[in-house]
């Protein structure tokens, strides 16, 4: 947490909603078990920290409850600090309902972990065996964050996982004098009734395979496992972007998107590829990158059947079929299918050549052009013809060479119908029809239609 967040936490004005990061189901499927455990541990740690320091929601609710009781002439009660914030609880419940959480398939191992944890429990309070999953998760979380005081926070959140969000109203309680008196818990009863009415409103919602209710978006019909996830989704329809970047002022609909964006300013790249060591700002980018090592290509074009390792690459490829060119140059009006191609094109206008050859000092506007050029120095010829075994430094030259074997002549003159195997051959031929002579001799001023003719002519002056 930042220093500003720490200060706000001390003042009791931070809620779990302010710091919670919620994944969509698509994003969640991209995480492996270790990453899911780390995410869960961080969320549980934040929840425990905020509830132990005093949630902003609880502060508002307690003030309202004290005011209500005072207006009715009732004595104020001291709310135990261990009470959980009822507004933040559903958010954590949504997180714990995500499928495939570590620990869901380890009930036997969970019991043994609970037993081990009980042996070291300084409070001496036994953990209930019917909370195997939650106990196991907290045990693992404690391993990930050794500084977290598990003994202090575990009972609170265990009660949360047993759905003790709205405690049953007690009819009687013992007074300090030892007498029994009727408890006036009307404020809590009203809250319980409110929760009950919300459940009735959602009774028509569809259910998951295990019987849990889903929350359905009234705009598009999409369903979600938790109300908080639904609230986040609905910002797609409303356009609401409540999270602002303090560095550039850009707004985002989710805190997770803001956190990803902030790394642009900080330069942080916390996700490292175990194969090649490359670093990424987002976990989804790392997952996409790792497919280059595994060879997985799950995204297939419905038009031509070509497969890609990344969804973004498929989206770019589809523009070949649709002809869409959404990126326009403000200087000359030319349009491009990809933003990267537009950025390369702009260097024609600016003259910027950021890629320099270390061997000869020649500069290039594109990195790919530099790589091709460097093969002049290294002699590398990675592209080999399967027909004759001849090798080439560039794939485009290999494609042109293959036409010798296939006899393909894809470039046809619109004037006379003559065909050529290379585009350069067609361009040279078209000069015959236009009469253009762009190649001029510096010595005598004679002009020629082809560069080769000029070179042959210049030998007359050099003789």
Curated annotation (Swiss-Prot):
Q: Where is the composition biased (Polar residues)?
A: 192-201
Instruction: Mark the C2H2-type zinc finger spans by residue number.
Output: 215-237, 243-265, 271-293, 299-321, 327-349, 355-377, 383-405, 411-433, 439-461
Which Gene3D superfamilies does its entry note?
A: 6.10.140.140, Classic Zinc Finger
The reply to whether Transcription regulation figures as a keyword in the UniProt entry is: yes
Every copy of the KRAB domain together lies at 14-89
Tissue-by-tissue expression:
Expressed in ovary and liver, and at lower levels in brain and muscle.
Record GO terms (molecular function): DNA binding; zinc ion binding
Q: Give Gene Ontology CC terms.
A: nucleus
Question: Region entry Disordered: which residue ranges?
Answer: 106-128, 171-211
Keyword line: DNA-binding, Metal-binding, Nucleus, Repeat, Repressor, Transcription, Transcription regulation, Zinc, Zinc-finger
Residue ranges annotated as compositionally biased, kind Basic and acidic residues, are 174-191
Q: Where in the cell is it found?
A: Nucleus
| Regions crossing the membrane | none
Query: Which Gene Ontology BP annotations are present?
Result: regulation of DNA-templated transcription
Record text on subunit structure and interactions: Interacts with HNRPK.
PANTHER family per UniProt: C2H2-TYPE DOMAIN-CONTAINING PROTEIN-RELATED, KRUEPPEL-LIKE TRANSCRIPTION FACTOR
Family indicated by similarity: Belongs to the krueppel C2H2-type zinc-finger protein family.
Protein role? May be a transcriptional repressor.
Q: What is this protein called?
A: Zinc finger protein interacting with ribonucleoprotein K
Supply the source organism for this entry.
Mus musculus
Name the gene that codes for it: Zik1
